[in-house]
Design a protein with these regions (language model features):
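A structural signal for short, well-ordered beta-strand segments
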Residues: 62-64, 102-104, 200-204
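Double-stranded beta-helix
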Residues: 96-99, 109-181
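Active-site rim elements
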Residues: 31-37, 88-90, 150-163, 182-187
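Non-heme Fe(II)-dependent double-stranded beta-helix
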Residues: 1-92
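Short, structured patches in soluble enzyme cores that scaffold and shape functional sites
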Residues: 68, 87-89, 100-108, 118-120
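A short beta-loop-beta micro-motif enriched in histidine and acidic residues
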Residues: 53, 86-99, 159-160, 166, ...
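Non-heme Fe(II)/2-oxoglutarate
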Residues: 131-134, 168-173, 177-270
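Secondary-structure boundary elements
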Residues: 49-58, 92-97, 105-113, 125
Length: 270
């Protein structure tokens, strides 16, 4: 297995399936004790409740992002920021404000290690995207909430992206219409025996945005250790991502135990 204190155990054969940006979305991670602990922290729920002006929330069953030190193995380096600037909301399928995403930062960031990159104010130009990319959007089903921008996109011109410096324990929230990504730093870290980045992904949305059918699936997901995306008003199974399915054909991962939830956590399930 993987030993946090021994980088020799972080090899590709043992490391869980990762998707863009070093996100580990599946294999039961969404129901690990660590993820449920973070969702149960009062300040996390209070932040989302303040945004939505609603205390009755549903949590995502999101995973985490862990960056292995690419000073150790170059192919561990994650996507450079300009290569995958994106939004996580379909401009036609979901116009307007629908979701505020979040993460709890677990390791203090640095210019060398990198982190989240945001284009300030870009959510205000979200409504213009269908006119700029009618052909591309026509090929993307309205239920697919991931849209990438080319490096020379006019929506990226004139506004300097910012990289978010976060202390351990900080909560970062952003509107899903915001153009963003994550990126390694511009400098070379001086160490190769520690994780460069560790975050817990968390998103909470009002229960009123969902429905009984989705909530029934969510309850079953807890028992079956099924992780999801950030959209807690719908049910999107992260274990069905194509690269996760392919990895599961050749590798068996030990899943965490079924969580024993307290009252607050159970309410966040629905």
């Amino acid at each position: 297995g993987i030993d946090r204190s021994d980088p020799e155990t972080w090899d590709d054969d043992r490391w869980p399936t990762a998707v863009h940006g070093g996100i580990l979305p599946s294999h039961g991670i969404g129901h690990s004790a660590a993820q449920w602990y973070i969702r149960d922290r009062a300040p996390v729920k209070q932040a989302f409740a303040a945004i939505w002006q609603d205390e009755d929330l549903l949590t995502s069953f999101d995973g985490v992002a862990l960056w292995r030190p690419w000073t150790r193995h170059g192919h561990w380096r994650t996507n450079n920021g300009p290569s995958w600037m994106h939004i996580d909301q379909h401009p036609i399928g979901r116009p307007g404000k629908h979701c505020v995403q979040g993460l709890v930062n677990l390791l203090t960031t640095s210019p060398a290690c990198g982190g989240n990159v945001m284009v300030p104010g870009s959510h205000k130009r979200f409504a213009a995207i269908p006119e700029l990319y009618p052909e591309r959007l026509a090929r993307i089903h309205p239920s697919i909430d991931h849209f990438r921008f080319p490096n020379d996109d006019e929506l990226l011109a004139g506004t300097e992206p910012i990289i978010c410096h976060l202390e351990a324990g900080d909560l970062l929230l952003w509107d899903s219409r915001t153009i963003h990504c994550s990126s390694p730093g511009l400098e070379t870290p001086s160490f190769n025996d520690q994780l460069f980045r560790a975050i817990s992904l968390v998103c909470m949305m009002p229960k009123s945005k969902s429905n009984d059918k989705v909530i029934a699936k969510r309850r079953a997901a807890v028992e079956n250790l099924v992780s999801t995306t950030n959209w807690s008003d719908r049910f999107i199974n992260a274990d069905e991502f194509p690269n996760v399915v392919e990895a599961s054909k050749v590798t068996t991962f030990k899943l965490p135990p079924v969580p024993e939830l307290n009252k607050n956590q159970t309410e966040l399930v629905g």
